[in-house]
Design a protein with these regions (language model features):
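Soluble extracytoplasmic regions of secretory-pathway and membrane proteins
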Residues: 4, 10-881, 885-898
Length: 900
C-alpha cells in the first residue's frame, strides 16, 4: 500500500513537472520571439494584465465564497455543539469555481485595458445622450465587473447554504436521527435549524445579490439600443415606452428587495425571501407580456408613424458606423456619344481594362511558372505600378514553397525544416496584354526573376501566405535556393529574422514548444542557427496584435528591390447603438459587427519578417485607444515609405460590407426606407456559365470630373427584382484621396444595361454562340470571365473575356476572345483593340440580331486545338512519372503548334 502511494505521488509529481515545463516553454518561446521582432512590450503588457486579473479574480472569488461557507459551517456546528467538518469538500468547490472565475476575468484583458485607455467618439446616442465610447468601452467593463460580483454573491450564498446543511445533516446522521425536511415538523427539523440559525447570514448575502442585480439591470437599460424587436435594429417604440420603464422599475425593485433582506436580518422571517423573489418574477412576466401586447396591438397597426424617429436613428447611426456618411452621391447622366477620339484620349483607362481574370490566370501561372511541384501560387492579386512611365494595372503572385507537395520519400524533418525553407520571386503581368498564343505577357517571370522594368535584389520569400511550419537557417545542411536546369542552387540565410538557437536552453524550449526532439539533438544546428516561426503573415500579424481583425487577402508588393506583404487590419465592435449588425465572414475568423474601420495597414518584410503597423485613419477612436494601450506599436501613415504607400488598396472585404449595406441605406428618407421603395441589390453575372453575384473589381480609370486616371475599386448596383443598372459605387485608393467613397446614380427614366442583360445579349448573338459551341465540341472548356463595366466619359463600355482550356485537370487557360458591348453594338474579336476598332472606328460591329455573323473557326484550327489538348494530357502523364525530359518535349511541340 505504501509503495502504491509513493508511485502515485511520483506520477503526479512528474505530470506536474511536465505541465509546468510545457507552459514555461510556451511562454519563454513566445517571449524570445517577441524580443526578436521588437514587440515584447505588447506581449508583456497583455500577459501581465491577464495574470493580474486572473490572480485578483481567483483570490477575491475564493476568499469571499470560502470565507462565507466557513462562517456558515461554524454557525451550524456551533448551534449543534459539534466542531465544523467537511472543509475539504467546501474548499474543492470554491477552488474550482474560483479558477473558472479567474480564467474568465483573465480572458477579459482587452475589455479592461480599453476602458482605462478609451478615447471618446465625440458623438452621442439619441436616447440617453451618452458618448458612443460609453457603449464601446465603458459599458462592457461595468458589465464585466457586475457580472463577476453577481456570480460571486450567488455562488457564495449557494456554497454557504450547502456548508450549513452539510453540517446539520452530518450531526443528525451521526446522532442516529433520520433527517427531515418537513418545515412543520416538531422534532427540530433541518429546515428549522436552517432558517433559525443561517437566515441572518443568508439575508446579508441576498442583499448583496440583489444590489448587484439592481446595478446590472440599471446597466441593462442601455442594452435596449441593440434591440431587434421593432422595425429596425435599435430601440423602437415598444422598447422606449415599455421595456425601458419596466427595466428601470425592476432595477429599483431589486434594490428595495435587497434592502428588505438586510432589514430581515432583524425580523428573521423566511416569508420575506419567498414573497420578494415571487414579486420580482411577477414584474418580469408582466413586463414581457406588456411588451408583446403593445408591439402587436399598438405598434404594428401603425408601425411607421410610431417608429419613424427610430428609423431615422438607425439610418444615421448605421451610415456613421460603417463610414458611409461621407459617401458623395452624384448623378451619372449616361449618353452614348463616344468616338474613337474619346477612346484615344482615355488610353490609360482602356489599356488597363482587366482582361485577365485571376482564377484562370492562376492556372496559367501554375503551368508556365511553377517549374517544380514543390512551389505554389496561393493567390493572384491586383495592384498598380509605374511601368516605363505609364500607370499600369497588374496581376502579381508570389512563388511560395509548399513542402506538402514534396514526394512522400522526401518528407523528412531535414527537408521540411532545414532544406526547403523559402519561396522564390514573383510573377507579374499587365492586366490587358495577351500574346498571340493567348497567354499573359510577363513583366516579371522565371527563376531567378527576370524583368525589363523591375529589379528584385532579394527575391526569397521566408514569410508568406503558405509558410505554415517553422524553418531553421544557418545550419550545416545546404539550404535549397532555386532550381537551375538539372542542378539546384543553394544558399545561406543572411537576414535578421528568427530566434537565435545559441544555447541548449533555447533548443530545449523550442523542442518542447514544437514537440520536435530534432531541434535538441540534430547535429546540423550550429551556434549561428536561427529558428524562423510564425511565418504565415496573417498569423504573424495576429500574434503580435490580436486586438485587431485582419483581412483575408494579404498581397505582395515589389518595392526598393525587395518583396513586402501588405495586410489590411480593421477595428471593429458590435456595440455601436442603433447600427445594423452584419456577419463579416472574411474578416478575422468571422465576426458579427456593427462598426468597422480599415484603420491600420500592416507591412511584413518577406525576407526578414519585420512587421510594421501604420495608422491610416487617425479619426477612429478605437485605433486611438489601442495606440494609448500599446504606445510605440503604431506609426503614422506618413512614415510609410512612398514606395509602399503607393500600393495601398481600398480593401475588398470592407468595400463589400459597405456596398451591401448601401443597397438599403442609401434610402435616407425614413418612409422610403421603411417601405423599401428604392432598394438596390448587387447584380449577378455569369462565370463559367454559372450565375453568381458580381464581385467588386479594381480598375484604373478617370472618374467623372477628374483630369487624371486613378486606381479605384468599383461595383455596380441594380434595382431589386430588376436587371438594369441603377448606379455604381467607387472607392479611391491613390493618395491624397485614399478612402473617398463615390456613388453615381443613373437616371430611373432611361434604361442602362445591367450585367445579366449584357450576358443575355451575348447569348443571343448567333456568331458568338456558334463559336462557343464549336470550341466546346473540340474538347475545350469555354470560360466566360467577369463582365466588367467600364465608365468612360459619360458612357459605359462592357467587356467580357473568353478563355479556352482543356477539359482535363491541370489545364493551361488561354485568352482567346474579347467581347465588347457598347450601346446597341456587340462584337467578339481576338483582341480588345480589334473589338474597339470594330465598334468605334469602323462602326460595323455586329448589332444585336445582325445578318452578317463572323466566319466560324476552321476545321484546321479545331484539329490543332485537339492535338494541343492531347499533347498536354501526355505531358501531364510524363510529369506524374517524373519524366521531365519527355514533359519538356511535349511542351516544345505544343509551342510549335501554337506558333503555327
Amino acid at each position: 500500500m505504501k509503495s502504491d502511494t509513493i508511485t502515485r505521488i511520483v506520477l503526479v509529481g512528474l505530470l506536474a513537472v511536465f505541465v509546468i515545463f510545457t507552459l514555461l516553454a510556451g511562454f519563454l518561446g513566445d517571449l524570445y520571439w517577441f524580443l526578436e521582432i521588437g514587440y515584447e512590450d505588447v506581449f508583456l503588457s497583455i500577459i501581465t494584465t491577464r495574470i493580474i486579473l486572473g490572480i485578483a479574480g481567483f483570490v477575491v472569488f475564493f476568499g469571499f465564497s470560502y470565507g462565507c461557507a466557513i462562517i456558515a459551517a461554524r454557525t451550524a456546528s456551533g448551534s449543534l455543539g459539534r466542531p465544523a467538518g467537511g472543509r475539504q469538500g467546501i474548499a474543492a468547490l470554491a477552488l474550482f469555481a474560483s479558477l473558472i472565475a479567474g480564467l474568465n476575468l483573465s480572458a477579459a484583458w482587452e475589455t479592461v485595458l480599453r476602458f482605462f485607455a478609451q478615447v471618446p467618439f465625440g458623438v452621442s446616442d439619441p436616447i440617453f445622450s451618452q458618448d458612443i465610447g460609453f457603449y464601446v468601452f465603458s459599458l462592457p467593463f461595468y458589465s464585466l465587473v457586475l457580472s463577476f460580483l453577481l456570480g460571486l454573491f450567488i455562488f457564495a450564498a449557494i456554497l454557504s447554504a450547502l456548508a450549513f446543511l452539510f453540517q446539520v445533516l452530518v450531526v443528525r446522521v451521526r446522532g442516529g436521527q433520520f433527517p427531515t425536511f418537513d418545515i412543520e415538523a416538531e422534532t427540530e427539523p433541518v429546515w428549522g435549524v436552517f432558517f433559525s440559525e443561517f437566515l441572518p447570514q443568508l439575508n446579508i448575502l441576498l442583499f448583496l445579490v440583489f444590489v448587484a442585480l439592481a446595478a446590472r439591470l440599471w446597466l441593462f437599460r442601455y442594452s435596449i439600443l441593440y434591440s431587434s424587436t421593432g422595425a429596425v435594429f435599435g430601440a423602437g417604440y415598444t422598447d422606449i415606452h415599455i421595456t425601458l420603464p419596466v427595466t428601470t422599475i425592476l432595477s429599483v425593485v431589486a434594490l428595495i428587495i435587497g434592502i428588505g433582506f438586510l432589514l430581515n436580518e432583524k425580523i428573521q422571517r423566511k416569508e420575506v425571501i419567498i414573497y420578494s423573489i415571487a414579486a420580482f418574477a411577477g414584474i418580469v412576466i408582466i413586463g414581457i407580456v406588456a411588451a408583446l401586447l403593445v408591439q402587436s396591438l399598438v405598434v404594428e397597426p401603425d408601425e411607421f408613424t410610431l417608429e419613424k424617429q427610430y428609423l431615422d436613428y438607425n439610418i444615421q447611426n448605421t451610415l456613421d458606423a460603417y463610414d458611409l456618411s461621407r459617401a458623395e452621391e452624384e448623378i451619372f447622366q449616361v449618353n452614348y456619344t463616344l468616338t474613337a477620339e474619346d477612346i484615344r484620349e482615355n488610353r490609360a483607362t482602356v489599356e488597363n481594362i482587366r482582361l485577365w481574370d485571376w482564377r484562370p490566370l492562376k492556372s496559367t501561372y501554375e503551368q508556365l511558372q511553377l517549374f517544380r511541384t514543390y512551389y505554389q501560387f496561393y493567390d493572384v492579386d491586383v495592384d498598380r505600378y509605374m511601368v516605363d512611365g505609364m500607370y499600369k494595372q497588374v496581376l502579381i503572385s508570389p512563388r511560395e514553397m509548399d513542402i506538402g507537395s514534396l514526394p512522400s520519400q522526401a518528407q523528412t524533418w531535414v527537408n521540411q525544416h532545414l532544406v526547403y525553407t523559402h519561396g522564390y520571386g514573383v510573377v507579374m503581368n499587365p492586366v490587358d496584354v495577351v500574346t498571340t498564343e493567348g497567354l499573359p505577357a510577363f513583366y516579371i517571370k522565371d527563376i531567378p526573376p527576370t524583368s525589363p522594368y523591375f529589379t528584385i535584389d532579394e527575391p526569397r520569400i521566408y514569410y508568406g501566405e503558405g509558410a505554415a511550419s517553422y524553418a531553421v537557417t544557418r545550419t550545416s545542411t545546404d539550404e535549397f535556393d532555386y532550381p537551375a536546369g538539372d542542378q539546384n542552387i543553394y544558399t545561406d540565410y543572411d537576414g535578421t529574422g528568427g530566434v537565435a538557437l545559441d544555447g541548449i536552453v533555447k533548443k530545449l524550449i523550442y523542442a518542447i514548444k514544437f514537440n520536435s526532439v530534432e531541434l535538441l539533438v540534430s547535429g546540423s544546428l550550429t551556434p549561428d542557427s536561427r529558428l524562423l516561426f510564425n511565418r504565415n503573415v496573417a498569423e504573424r500579424t495576429a500574434q503580435i496584435a490580436p486586438f485587431l481583425s485582419y483581412d483575408a487577402d494579404p498581397y505582395i508588393v515589389v518595392a526598393d528591390g525587395r518583396l513586402y506583404w501588405i495586410i489590411d487590419a480593421y477595428t471593429t465592435t458590435d456595440a455601436y447603438p442603433y447600427s445594423e449588425p452584419v456577419m463579416a465572414w472574411n474578416i478575422g475568423s468571422g465576426e458579427r459587427l456593427n462598426y468597422i474601420r480599415n484603420s491600420v495597414k500592416v507591412v511584413v518584410d518577406a525576407y526578414n519578417g519585420d512587421v510594421s503597423y501604420y495608422i491610416i485613419d487617425p479619426a477612429d477612436p478605437i485605433v486611438s485607444t489601442y495606440d494609448r494601450m500599446f504606445p510605440g506599436v503604431f506609426q503614422g501613415i506618413e512614415e510609410m515609405p512612398d514606395s509602399l504607400s503607393s500600393h495601398l488598396r481600398y480593401p475588398e472585404d470592407f468595400f463589400r460590407i459597405q456596398a451591401q449595406l448601401y443597397t438599403i441605406y442609401h434610402m435616407k428618407d425614413p418612409r422610403v426606407f421603411y417601405n423599401r421603395e428604392d432598394a438596390w441589390v448587387i447584380p449577378d453575372e455569369l462565370y463559367r456559365q454559372q450565375r453568381q453575384q458580381m464581385v467588386p473589381y479594381y480598375i484604373i480609370m478617370k472618374l467623372p470630373g477628374e483630369e487624371e486616371e486613378e486606381f479605384i475599386m468599383m461595383l455596380p448596383f441594380t434595382p431589386r427584382n430588376k436587371e438594369n443598372l441603377i448606379g455604381w459605387m467607387a472607392a479611391r485608393s491613390d493618395q491624397p484621396v485614399y478612402g473617398d467613397l463615390l456613388v453615381y446614380q443613373f437616371s430611373k427614366q432611361e434604361l442602362t444595361y445591367g450585367p445579366m442583360q449584357v450576358e443575355a445579349r451575348i447569348d443571343q448573338d448567333t456568331a458568338i454562340s456558334q463559336d462557343i459551341t464549336l470550341w466546346s465540341q473540340s474538347g475545350s472548356d469555354v470560360v466566360r470571365g467577369n463582365t466588367l463595366i467600364i465608365p468612360i466619359e459619360n458612357s459605359l463600355l462592357y467587356v467580357e473575356p473568353l478563355y479556352l482550356e482543356a477539359s482535363e485537370r491541370g489545364t493551361l487557360p488561354q485568352l482567346k476572345r474579347v467581347i465588347v458591348v457598347y450601346n446597341d453594338r456587340l462584337t467578339m474579336q481576338e483582341t480588345l483593340s480589334d473589338a474597339l476598332s470594330v465598334i468605334f472606328e469602323e462602326g460595323t460591329g455586329t448589332p444585336e440580331g445582325g445578318e452578317e455573323p463572323r466566319p466560324p473557326i476552321s476545321e484546321t484550327d479545331l484539329e490543332r486545338l485537339a492535338r494541343i489538348a492531347d499533347l498536354y494530357d501526355r505531358a501531364q502523364q510524363a510529369l506524374s512519372r517524373g519524366d521531365l525530359g519527355q514533359y519538356q518535349r511535349y511542351f516544345d511541340e505544343i509551342g510549335d503548334l501554337v506558333k503555327g
